[in-house]
From Swiss-Prot:
Molecular function terms, GO-annotated: alpha-1,6-mannosyltransferase activity
Localization of this protein: Endoplasmic reticulum membrane; Golgi apparatus membrane
Full protein name: Mannan polymerase I complex VAN1 subunit
Entry function: Involved in regulation of the phosphorylation of a number of proteins, some of which appear to be important in cell growth control. The M-Pol I complex possesses alpha-1,6-mannosyltransferase activity and is probably involved in the elongation of the mannan backbone of N-linked glycans on cell wall and periplasmic proteins.
Source species taxonomy: Eukaryota, Fungi, Dikarya, Ascomycota, Saccharomycotina
Species whose genome carries this gene: Saccharomyces cerevisiae (strain ATCC 204508 / S288c) (Baker's yeast)
Amino acid sequence: MGMFFNLRSNIKKKAMDNGLSLPISRNGSSNNIKDKRSEHNSNSLKGKYRYQPRSTPSKFQLTVSITSLIIIAVLSLYLFISFLSGMGIGVSTQNGRSLLGSSKSSENYKTIDLEDEEYYDYDFEDIDPEVISKFDDGVQHYLISQFGSEVLTPKDDEKYQRELNMLFDSTVEEYDLSNFEGAPNGLETRDHILLCIPLRNAADVLPLMFKHLMNLTYPHELIDLAFLVSDCSEGDTTLDALIAYSRHLQNGTLSQIFQEIDAVIDSQTKGTDKLYLKYMDEGYINRVHQAFSPPFHENYDKPFRSVQIFQKDFGQVIGQGFSDRHAVKVQGIRRKLMGRARNWLTANALKPYHSWVYWRDADVELCPGSVIQDLMSKNYDVIVPNVWRPLPTFLGTEQPYDLNSWMESQEALALAKTLDEDDVIVEGYAEYPTWRVHLAYIRDAEGDPNEAVDLDGVGGVSILAKAKIFRNGVQFPAFTFENHAETEAFGKMAKKMGYRVGGLPHYTIWHIYEPSDDDLKEIASREREKRRQSE
């Protein structure tokens, strides 16, 4: 199942002029088409809906009508009271997972009209059906009926060529793929980007994810968003919340929604909620707070070129808890399934005009808004930043998170020769001593963020890749490729096909901290000790 959203320029004006309630793409009809409803004059409406005398209702009919009105009134009153008791929240789910603005204030949200031409290029071009229909009886008939002759004046010829091009554009689009190779200065060359985000049981982190998306300083009109929701638990609200957030994102009202949500959450938060925050480094907590506090960049609320939402399951049955996802025995199975999901999303969302593909996890907590152009500027075919995560102070405040970005070692190559063909080497586990150089471990907090190193394997938290490598056959192996799978195998495959794979050791983004079972036990133990000491 796929759902698609896109924004057009001058939405309000065109909607009022044309009587349209939804934007229309080249796959439908043009924004310039006249509303067929306006063609009916008042006389025809009067004829169609001529008054017809009705027979006098019986007492039984009157009784039934009055009873129906009473039932409707009671139900309406019940729904109204229920609405008020829900704190006036327009769209919500239990436990505060998704609160999308109060019904009272949502009417006053400011929306944005868009003028950038990139919102309307390629498959979003304006195609006017009235112009196209002129050619229904052939070009010769068009010339005679429109201009009275097949010999055109320069002015008439200009109009003819313009309308003929619109006819061709309605069915044929020509792409010179050499124009979409991916440039290191993509900001200046206006490179289009496909931004892919896989989601599973992710309702709780969607606000964080969308705030990061809005904070991207790469022009939003050049970014197409593609989400894949898969294998969620029964009762999970990820898909519904994602659709609701996306609509507000494309209306330019999502930041206003988040202000309201944050206020509600703050008023409902209890002292025991996210108890682990008491044990986090205060400096890091302040950095997170500053990252999501105004002022934001001037295009923070600007909608993206398009949003596509896909839902497809791949048979993933592994739990989403930290301990479940990171158990060594499930890593091979899990990564092959994730490889299938990534390949499916790429195949369905990648367009000929995309120059870059940016893969991003939803649960990144801190990341520069300029990350796309920062990675792009290094001109690698595949490039990743360093990924760390914060820790409670009793665990050292921070640690490397993504160990899947590495340089190959002789020890790992020798290890692979001892394994079965279908075995998957997993980094960071004692069962697989590879002795590789990991990008995470060569980080210097004060190092040059522009320094780049060549890599063999890459992690999947944040990957920028040139779109041409996918067109040329590189994929996220959903099978064992040189004893690896998914993103690590993706890096190895890209390198084997002659592409440059690299990473930035001193350019760090931060993953959210997810307490493990052992961490939660330690925090509970410390809390009990505090209570004993205070008694």
